[in-house]
């Protein structure tokens, strides 16, 4: 069995599947440890699952997050208690921890390696995979955990790949004066910025911005000063924080178009199956849950068709609506008028805000 991509979905799937007796090889284009653009807030819906499977990194002191702060583009904010809450942890630490566990438990890793071509051979009922190191593999099952956007999406001719997206993602780690129990979402014209505590007293500062604004101002730093700093709360964070990296992690072409959980017999996991808007704060939990779903499908399905149908059905029942709600409410964020409406809803009709949160999150599993 081959897993393409070593993010949360791929790593957790490898750990679950090797425990079930599968021989698992995982291909990852980078070499651990490394940073990823990610909000680094994990919903507590995964807490029981992680502890039950001995995957929770209890050697780290992680901040417990139970409050949501929302500010509009003018910097006026409102707070809302979170029913489930969550915790903050960097992908640098979490991915490294899961990678080390998987290596110890027998997962074979091909790091610094990419898949250059992938075809399903109907007659042989096998996948043929070509790797960047010129290896050619033939395997019966391939899991696609290659993230938001990959060259494999182009190889598979997935429809979203040809649609340009205006969104960019930018992430920093900082030292700052902030509340460790609060995850904040600060709006600015054209996007929004998440801010929450992670391990070792650090904070994650990660925002979804607009490519056109970056072009207009010529650099990330100038765009931040001209656009993000118009929200006084963001201006204060940027001015008063100690930035721990020389330059941020940046990704482009972040696309929230619908995707399918199964493409040409590939079982898609995490962001490769569907990317939830970051404002929902649920991508990391969904990645881990999809790993569990695919493990259950492979256990219970007797044929390829049964596995694919089982996985598609369960994936859609749990995530399809969640992704749709995220896309629908995205318009309330990153605009002056929309963010004021959202702030007023949270402040004066908290029931609506809680309903939206419930519809973008799942139950503990």
Q: What is the meaning of each model-derived region?
A:
Residues 296-365:
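C-terminal helical "tail/cap" subdomain of flavin- and related membrane-associated enzymes
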Residues 215-294, 305:
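FAD/FMN-dependent oxidoreductases across multiple families
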Residues 47-99:
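A conserved beta-strand/loop capping segment in the N-terminal third of enzymes
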Residues 2-6, 15-38:
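Glycine-rich FAD pyrophosphate-binding loop
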Residues 101-234:
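Predominantly flavin-linked oxidoreductase catalytic cores and closely associated redox partners
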């Amino acid at each position: 069995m081959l897993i393409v991509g070593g993010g949360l979905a791929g790593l957790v799937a490898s750990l679950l599947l090797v425990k079930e007796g599968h021989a698992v090889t995982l291909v990852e284009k980078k070499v651990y440890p490394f940073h990823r653009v990610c909000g680094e807030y994990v919903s507590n819906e995964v807490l029981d699952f992680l502890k039950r499977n001995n995957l929770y990194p209890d050697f780290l002191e992680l901040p417990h997050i139970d409050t949501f702060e929302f500010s509009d583009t003018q910097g006026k904010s409102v707070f809302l208690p979170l029913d489930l809450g969550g915790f903050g942890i960097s992908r640098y630490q979490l991915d490294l921890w899961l990678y080390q566990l998987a290596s110890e438990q027998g997962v074979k890793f091909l790091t610094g390696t990419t898949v250059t071509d992938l075809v399903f051979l109907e007659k042989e009922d096998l996948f043929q995979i070509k790797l960047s190191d010129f290896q050619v593999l033939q395997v019966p099952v391939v899991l696609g955990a290659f993230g938001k956007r990959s060259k494999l999406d182009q190889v598979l001719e997935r429809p979203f790949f040809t649609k340009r997206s205006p969104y960019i993602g930018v992430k920093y780690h900082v030292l700052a004066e902030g509340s460790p129990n609060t995850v904040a979402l600060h709006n600015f014209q054209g996007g929004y910025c998440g801010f929450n505590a992670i391990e070792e007293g650090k904070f994650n500062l990660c925002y979804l911005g607009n490519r056109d604004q970056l072009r207009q101002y010529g650099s990330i730093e100038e765009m931040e000063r001209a656009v993000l700093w118009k929200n006084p709360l963001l201006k204060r964070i940027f001015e008063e924080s100690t930035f721990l990296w020389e330059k941020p992690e940046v990704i482009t072409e972040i696309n929230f178009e619908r995707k399918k959980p199964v493409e040409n017999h590939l079982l898609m996991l995490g962001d490769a199956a569907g990317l939830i808007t970051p404002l929902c704060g649920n991508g990391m939990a969904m990645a881990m849950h999809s790993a569990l779903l695919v493990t259950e499908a492979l256990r219970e399905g007797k044929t390829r068709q049964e596995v694919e149908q089982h996985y598609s059905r369960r994936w859609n029942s749990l995530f399809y609506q969640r992704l749709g709600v995220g896309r629908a409410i995205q318009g309330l964020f990153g605009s002056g008028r929309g963010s004021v409406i959202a702030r007023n809803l949270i402040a004066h009709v908290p029931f609506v805000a809680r309903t939206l949160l419930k519809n973008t999150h799942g139950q503990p599993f």
